[in-house]
Amino acid sequence: MKLVDEAEILVTAGNGGNGCVGFRREKFIPLGGPDGGDGGAGGSVWIVADENVNTLVDFRHERTFKAQRGENGMGRQAYGKGGEDRIIVVPVGTVVINVQTDEVIGDLTQHGDRLLVAKGGKGGLGNMHFKSSVNRAPRQATTGEEGEERLLKLELKLLADVGLLGFPNAGKSTLIRAVSAATPKVADYPFTTLYPNLGVVSVEAYRSFVIADVPGLIEGAADGAGLGTQFLRHLQRTRLLLHLVDISPALGVYGEGGVDGVSPADQVRTIERELERHDPELLKKPRWLVLNKADLMFEDEARAAAETIVAELGWTAPWYLVSALGRDGTFPIMKDVMAFFDRQREDELEARNAG
């Protein structure tokens, strides 16, 4: 499924109903006092996170959301009925931003999270509130308040455990196909992945994690080059990054905009610079190196090339030599990832118990 991860919507809460000017009219009570009721409150607009929704695509077609207006007050001190709230359902992981102020209003990270984005107006006061010793028959009532209106930007950050990053054509889509049931488009040219893809990796029964295939990054990505920063945000919520590198760039024909002439080590350094420019915290995340396309070389050549790259980078974190296309060496990575998450959970539990 193509994942639309940005949308702008206009939300308008309901206006409050007007207060009523009314007087008590009953038999044998010819001069009844004021009894105009208050108007009902306008409906509010809420955004609710739902785990069964995984895209913002519906907001491409419907961008305006209005809550119901409150009903006017009536005689006999009857209050107007409040307007119904408007509920907007979004995927878990949606960030809501006020376009006018660029302020983050809320971050919906759990199923069922609710966020008030536009509050309904208060109902107007009926004339029963304006009776006094000098004005026993007031003909004064107030109108309902206007509901809030906001232009909002919705951003969807994938809630994935593992993020795949690398240059275009490094083999990220091929890897996610190899280890999960996801079926992203795969072809021999850059920018095949135009939208993030999610896959669930099942290591054992009831033991799995979510992996995200994010479109390839190139130099200048933090400034919007290539597919820009709109996909870098998806890496912010991952717990582990797998950095894929094509170890045989000289054997691949990438075409314009690709990575011709860029050594594997320089590919790693380039992406590290882009991550630091976009969000330095990303470089603090655990990151493992996955040297891909070993099938394009003889085994001893691939191993020697991999060791040279690791030495050139001074890489100290875990690294792997794989062929995503042939699924050679991919499953051991997934087992190690699962074990890494198990250790993380144990450490977090110990820290909570100690605290």
Curated annotation (Swiss-Prot):
Its EC number is 3.6.5.-. GO terms for molecular function: GTP binding; GTPase activity; magnesium ion binding. Its main location: cytoplasm. Pfam families: GTP1_OBG, MMR_HSR1. Keywords: Cytoplasm, GTP-binding, Hydrolase, Magnesium, Metal-binding, Nucleotide-binding. It comes from the Bacteria. GO terms for cellular component: cytoplasm. GTP binds at residues 166-173, 191-195, 213-216, 292-295, 323-325. Residues 160-342 form the OBG-type G domain. Mg(2+) binds at S173, T193. GO terms for biological process: ribosome biogenesis. The keyword tRNA processing does not apply. Its cofactor is Mg(2+). InterPro entries: G_OBG, GTP-bd, GTP-bd_Obg/CgtA, GTP1-OBG_CS, GTP1_OBG_dom, GTP1_OBG_dom_sf, OBG_GTPase, P-loop_NTPase. It is found in: Cytoplasm. Residues 1-159 form the Obg domain. An essential GTPase which binds GTP, GDP and possibly (p)ppGpp with moderate affinity, with high nucleotide exchange rates and a fairly low GTP hydrolysis rate. Plays a role in control of the cell cycle, stress response, ribosome biogenesis and in those bacteria that undergo differentiation, in morphogenesis control. PANTHER family: DEVELOPMENTALLY REGULATED GTP-BINDING PROTEIN-RELATED, MITOCHONDRIAL RIBOSOME-ASSOCIATED GTPASE 2. Monomer. Belongs to the TRAFAC class OBG-HflX-like GTPase superfamily. OBG GTPase family. This is GTPase Obg. It comes from Xanthomonas axonopodis pv. citri (strain 306). The gene is obg.
